[in-house]
């Protein structure tokens, strides 16, 4: 078996040469990282969230360091669907034609999501939509779409009806029980899941006696959340039949294989990109060696082995 075949995985809409994907919000639209290495090396790219209209994000400060991680409250800053369709996605396709794009979609109400999902699949090389259901629903008192199984299912159904590409749903860990939500979005037609999104957290400045972030709360990411991600992925993998792209604290080839053991079929790398811009190609390069170390001949076989063990 060639090195390439060992790492390749097939998921709905995605034929990946390797399973490593920069996570949405940690890689922009690839422009900055393209100065460092050829993005065609990546399995895929989850681009920054797209909303119907431009978003300027939250007031600063909006990033804070934590032990083994970071808090962010960026607020989905992006130039909006029109600019992303006209400039950002075509640039990626022109410069990196072998890189499948996963478009992350966010909104404040169901109609916003539907409008973006109806169009973004037309952009060149967009193979999959990642639906960010952790956004507050302005029509339901600001409660996140992803915290209620019925609301999440209705959103998925509406977006699925207009989407031209497979739909993956990004699950929030900030819930009492993630399983009913995973089952609800699968029943509503989701083609895959991505998980986990950030955990909510806060930090205080001892001098000012106030929260460090202007938004007060932020999303916690980085190595600190990996055990939580593994636990939730493992839980969800027992009850759904659609593939999971695992994320949360991944920074090494060993972490990637742990995600597979939990039930993931591909892996996204987020916060680690800030500490080391080369982390994704380094993991891709190291993966075959670590697979050898643990007697893993291919990722597809590992996926099957994990699936068989849950029966």
Swiss-Prot record:
Keywords attached to this entry: Cytoplasm, Flavoprotein, FMN, NAD, Oxidoreductase, Pyrimidine biosynthesis
Gene Ontology terms: biological process: 'de novo' pyrimidine nucleobase biosynthetic process; 'de novo' UMP biosynthetic process
InterPro entries listed in its UniProt record: Aldolase_TIM, DHO_dehydrogenase, DHOD_1B, Dihydroorotate_DH_1, Dihydroorotate_DH_1_2, Dihydroorotate_DH_cat, Dihydroorotate_DH_CS, Dihydroorotate_DH_I
Catalytic activity: (S)-dihydroorotate + NAD(+) = orotate + NADH + H(+)
Cellular component aspect of the GO annotation: cytoplasm
Classification via PROSITE patterns: DHODEHASE_1 (PS00911), DHODEHASE_2 (PS00912)
Protein name as it appears in the record: Dihydroorotate dehydrogenase B (NAD(+)), catalytic subunit
Species assigned in the record: Lactococcus lactis subsp. lactis (strain IL1403) (Streptococcus lactis)
């Amino acid at each position: 078996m060639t090195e390439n075949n060992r790492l390749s995985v097939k998921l709905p809409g995605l034929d990946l040469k390797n399973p490593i994907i920069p996570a949405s919000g940690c890689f922009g639209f690839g422009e900055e990282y393209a100065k460092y290495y050829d993005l065609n090396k990546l399995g895929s790219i989850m681009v920054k969230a797209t909303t119907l209209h431009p978003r300027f994000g939250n007031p600063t400060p909006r990033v804070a360091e934590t032990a083994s991680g970071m808090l962010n409250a960026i607020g989905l800053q992006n130039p909006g669907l029109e600019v992303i369709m006209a400039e950002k996605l075509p640039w990626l396709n022109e410069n990196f034609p072998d890189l499948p794009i996963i478009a992350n979609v966010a909104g404040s109400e169901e109609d916003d999501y539907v409008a973006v999902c109806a169009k973004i699949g037309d952009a060149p090389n967009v193979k999959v939509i990642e639906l960010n259901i952790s956004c507050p629903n302005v029509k339901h008192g600001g409660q996140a779409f992803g915290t209620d199984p019925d609301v999440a299912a209705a959103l998925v159904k509406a977006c699925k009806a207009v989407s031209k590409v497979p739909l993956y749903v990004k699950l929030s860990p900030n819930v009492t029980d993630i399983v009913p939500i995973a089952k609800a979005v699968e029943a509503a037609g989701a083609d895959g899941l991505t998980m986990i999104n950030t955990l909510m957290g806060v930090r205080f400045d001892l001098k000012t006696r106030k929260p460090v972030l202007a938004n007060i709360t932020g999303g916690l990411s980085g190595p600190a959340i990996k055990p939580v991600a593994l636990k939730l992925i493992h839980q969800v993998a027992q009850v759904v039949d659609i593939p999971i792209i695992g994320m949360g604290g991944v920074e090494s080839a060993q972490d990637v294989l742990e995600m597979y053991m939990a039930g993931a079929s591909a892996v996204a790398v987020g916060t680690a990109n800030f500490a080391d811009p080369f982390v994704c190609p380094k993991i891709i390069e190291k993966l075959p060696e670590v697979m050898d170390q643990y007697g893993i001949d291919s990722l597809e076989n590992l996926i099957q082995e994990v699936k068989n063990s849950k029966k």
